[in-house]
């Protein structure tokens, strides 16, 4: 049996904070604001994983109203979501991710992001799709979005 999860997240760029995407720090003049580290990709993956096993969403597990999660590394969110899918008897088959942002260019970092996500999800890098698009005509210059679909397989 398989299950599919869909994840989405968005964060605004701000000066003075590091840019975290896929569990990595990416060199850039601005980072993504958020209650945690603002890792838009890991947040969308977390939502997709939790949704695939009908466990809720990232806000139910890590509410922004809880000071415990202020500045938290989003890797913790992925680890918790992975515990839920494993407890439900599933493993990740593959994940496909689209990042929507004007800058920085993701191409030079795509392989490192792919490897980081693969390690977190306990899959091969070839099972992780990382794509980047620009938000042409959408007036989203100061924002990054992530769209994710994940396929889970029964273990």
Curated annotation (Swiss-Prot):
UniProt entry tagged with the keyword Glycosyltransferase: no
Cofactor: record remark: Binds 1 divalent metal cation per subunit.
UniProt subunit comment: Homotrimer.
Binding site for 4-CDP-2-C-methyl-D-erythritol 2-phosphate: 9-11, 35-36, 57-59
Residue sites binding a divalent metal cation per the record: 9, 11, 43
Gene: ispF
Keyword tags: Isoprene biosynthesis, Lyase, Metal-binding
Family that this chain belongs to: Belongs to the IspF family.
Name of the featured protein: 2-C-methyl-D-erythritol 2,4-cyclodiphosphate synthase
Role summary: Involved in the biosynthesis of isopentenyl diphosphate (IPP) and dimethylallyl diphosphate (DMAPP), two major building blocks of isoprenoid compounds. Catalyzes the conversion of 4-diphosphocytidyl-2-C-methyl-D-erythritol 2-phosphate (CDP-ME2P) to 2-C-methyl-D-erythritol 2,4-cyclodiphosphate (ME-CPP) with a corresponding release of cytidine 5-monophosphate (CMP).
EC number annotated for this UniProt entry: 4.6.1.12
Pathway(s) of this molecule: Isoprenoid biosynthesis; isopentenyl diphosphate biosynthesis via DXP pathway; isopentenyl diphosphate from 1-deoxy-D-xylulose 5-phosphate: step 4/6
GO biological process: isopentenyl diphosphate biosynthetic process, methylerythritol 4-phosphate pathway; terpenoid biosynthetic process
Organism: Koribacter versatilis (strain Ellin345)
InterPro entries named among the record's database cross-references: MECDP_synthase, MECDP_synthase_CS, MECDP_synthase_sf
Annotated positions for site Transition state stabilizer: 35, 134
CDD domains xrefs: MECDP_synthase
Transmembrane spans: none
GO molecular function: 2-C-methyl-D-erythritol 2,4-cyclodiphosphate synthase activity; metal ion binding
Reaction(s) catalysed by this chain's protein: 4-CDP-2-C-methyl-D-erythritol 2-phosphate = 2-C-methyl-D-erythritol 2,4-cyclic diphosphate + CMP
Any Pfam family the entry gives: YgbB
């Amino acid at each position: 049996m398989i299950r599919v999860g869909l994840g989405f997240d968005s964060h605004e760029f701000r000066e003075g904070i590091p840019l975290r995407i896929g569990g990595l720090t990416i060199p850039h003049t601005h980072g993504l604001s958020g209650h945690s580290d603002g890792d838009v990709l890991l947040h969308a993956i977390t939502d997709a994983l939790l949704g695939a096993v009908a466990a809720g969403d990232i806000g139910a597990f890590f509410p922004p109203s809880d000071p415990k999660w202020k500045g938290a590394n989003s890797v913790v969110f992925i680890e918790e979501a992975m515990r839920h899918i494993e407890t439900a008897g599933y493993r990740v088959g593959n994940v496909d991710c689209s990042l929507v942002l004007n800058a920085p260019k993701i191409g030079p970092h795509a392989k490192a992001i792919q490897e980081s996500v693969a390690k977190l999800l306990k899959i091969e890098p070839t099972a992780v799709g990382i794509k980047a698009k620009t938000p042409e005509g959408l007036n989203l210059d100061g924002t990054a979005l992530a769209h994710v679909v994940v396929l889970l397989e029964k273990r």
